[in-house]
């Protein structure tokens, strides 16, 4: 069994860095505008129709832009370990990209 969840973020809301240790995650963006970023890599701006594949063991975060809600289907294999929050400096800097 692989769980599928519909996740909605209010404008300006993001999750913390996290890792999926035993499997990966697929995000199917269904609405709004958001961000996805793997640690040490540039952030990716997301909109409806985008697909993100995160492989197991990759530290990452995702969530809404400051001015839009964001919604995706999350297909996640294995448990998630949530880590430190994304800093305001990192998140605020994305709006200038």
Protein language model features and the residues they cover:
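A generic "binding-loop/recognition-motif" signal
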Residues: 13, 22-23, 42, 58, ...
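Glycine- and acidic-residue-biased ligand/ion/polar-headgroup-sensing regions
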Residues: 22-34, 39-40
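Short, charged/polar surface micro-motifs in flexible loops or helix N-caps
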Residues: 9-13, 33-34, 80
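Short beta-strand His + acidic residue motifs that chelate non-heme Fe in jelly-roll/DSBH
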Residues: 16-17, 36-37, 44, 59-65
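Short acidic-glycine-tyrosine-enriched beta hairpin
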Residues: 40-57
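A short glycine-rich, His/Asp/Glu-containing loop-to-beta-strand
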Residues: 1-17, 23
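Conserved GNAT-family N-acetyltransferase fold
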Residues: 7, 27, 52
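Double-stranded beta-helix
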Residues: 3, 61-97
